[in-house]
From Swiss-Prot:
Keywords, comma-separated and alphabetical: Lyase
Annotated family: Belongs to the archaeal dihydroneopterin aldolase family.
Subunit structure of this chain's protein: Homotetramer.
EC code(s) of this entry: 4.1.2.25
Protein name: Dihydroneopterin aldolase
Keyword flag Lyase: yes
Binding annotation for substrate: E16, M111
Amino acid sequence: MKYFKRLSDRERAIFEAGITLGAIYHQFCGTPVSPGTAEEVAKCIERAALLQPCVIDARVEVDVSSEDTDNYGGYTEVSGRNLRVTIVTRCGEWEAVGKLEFIEELNYPLMWVEEIRRVEQ
């Protein structure tokens, strides 16, 4: 594709993983969730991520406890503190594994590239 001709497949796999993680974070944070709906919300996020170019696997966890929802409405929202995501992208012979997880020592929902690997086609 002409828009990516200056990128190697390796660079594009990394780019697509990062774009997908950012889209998940900024699109789904704020979504209402409860312990009874957390798994469904996570599956919805996974299915949406798999629509992104080059994404071949998406694993999402939304960790919501009953303590989080002990309030008037009985729910909380998806946030950087309760969202854990693993994305795998493939472009050509390269795969990238991207992660999103709240890191306590940083007090921050960090996105990073965990692995880049060459695969057989």
